[in-house]
Design a protein with these regions (language model features):
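Membrane-proximal intracellular helices of multi-pass ion channels
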Residues: 1-348
């Protein structure tokens, strides 16, 4: 079901924009309520067909590679579905920890691939290589992964037999967290504070827009960073006219407004959720990471809910709050929040 859910959410999101003319027309058109689905119906059908082909092809390729590595068929299917949909449900208590190095490396690669904007794959299939390589989001995505993995490797190298094992474990956990898959090969809850902090920051970061991953998304963070840079520039040059651009194209005021509103709502949900579950009297790290990991659809957190823990410790009320966070995060906040508006129910 999480394999179907991963693709279902992706198609639902991308049916809200014209794929061919827009190529990831800046995050918010792809991930917030936008153009009428009816007007886009012909493109929606062709888009869904292309996306399903890419999604299924990557999933089949992963299953084959896992089988070649000696993983049983049932395990391969479960692992591939969990990786593709970034659901991360494992059939073993140690997640992916007991599988071979080959299996772990293959899953690492495919977790990262499923976190890439699927529009990039479409551009590659249509041989628009230069346009695909110009994607600021994808370049930033890979930069964050590599930089984070290298920093963690340096920080945890003393915990492993050699630096290569530390590097492999770092890349696996970074790939798992940033794509919101949630697999684990080791108890990173025991890692040094620096490494755990990096993983928490990656939980917020999330994968690319138009992927099966969750989180805030790289594109939103890029737009926010560009917005801050623009404001600083205007402080120095009040009369300057400076436009925010993504992939060489100017970003509209509507997109920036939607991005800012998303972040405000996101922070409000985080603050409210932490406050409510704090009545369970668990430590701040447990409460904070519980909210962050559920809202971003990652899975494991830190402290009492690390890779070897679970959410069974929370009260029924807290579980309801965290369940709401999971649904809201997976649906990009606004679709589920609309259900709480009186105007929504007056239409039925």
């Amino acid at each position: 079901s999480h394999w179907i859910g991963g693709m279902g959410v992706l198609v639902f999101i991308l049916t809200l924009l014209p794929l061919a003319g827009g190529y990831h027309m800046n995050l918010m058109k792809a991930e917030s309520p936008g153009p009428s689905v009816g007007k886009l119906l012909p493109k929606v059908q062709s888009t869904a067909k292309i996306l399903y082909k890419i999604y299924i092809a990557l999933t089949v390729a992963l299953i084959i590679l896992l089988l070649l590595g000696g993983m049983p068929l049932y395990d391969s299917l479960c692992a591939a579905f969990g990786t593709a949909g970034t659901g991360g449900f494992g059939i073993k208590s140690d997640s992916m920890g007991s599988y071979s190095l080959y299996i772990q490396i293959v899953i690492t690669i495919f977790m990262i691939l499923f976190g890439v904007n699927f529009n990039v794959y479409f551009l590659l299939l249509t041989r628009k290589f230069s346009q695909a390589l110009k994607s600021e989001e994808v370049r930033c995505y890979f930069f964050v992964i590599i930089a984070s993995a290298l920093m963690i490797t340096f920080n945890v190298r003393h915990l492993f037999d050699n630096v290569w094992e530390a590097l492999q474990q770092a890349f696996f956990q970074v790939g798992s967290i940033i794509t919101t898959t949630g697999y684990a090969t080791t108890d990173f809850n025991q890692w040094p504070a620096v490494s755990r902090t990096i993983l928490v920051l990656l939980t917020f970061c999330g994968a690319c827009a138009g992927s099966t991953g969750g989180g805030i998304k790289i594109s939103r963070l890029l737009l926010l960073a560009k917005s801050v840079r623009k404001e600083l520039h205007l402080y120095l040059h009040p009369n300057a006219v400076k436009k925010i651009k993504m992939d060489g194209k100017a970003v509209s005021h509507e997109v920036m407004r939607a991005t800012n509103i998303y972040m405000i709502v996101y922070l409000m949900i985080v603050a409210t959720s932490i406050f409510i579950i704090s009545f369970d009297e668990f430590d701040l790290v447990t409460n904070f990471t519980a909210v962050v990991t559920t809202l971003n659809n990652v899975g494991p957190g830190l402290s009492l809910i690390g890779p070897t823990g679970n959410f069974g410790i929370f009260s029924p009320l807290s579980k309801l709050v965290l369940s709401f966070d999971m649904l809201a995060g997976r649906l990009e906040l606004f679709p589920i929040l609309i259900l709480f508006l009186r105007e929504t129910w007056k239409k039925f």
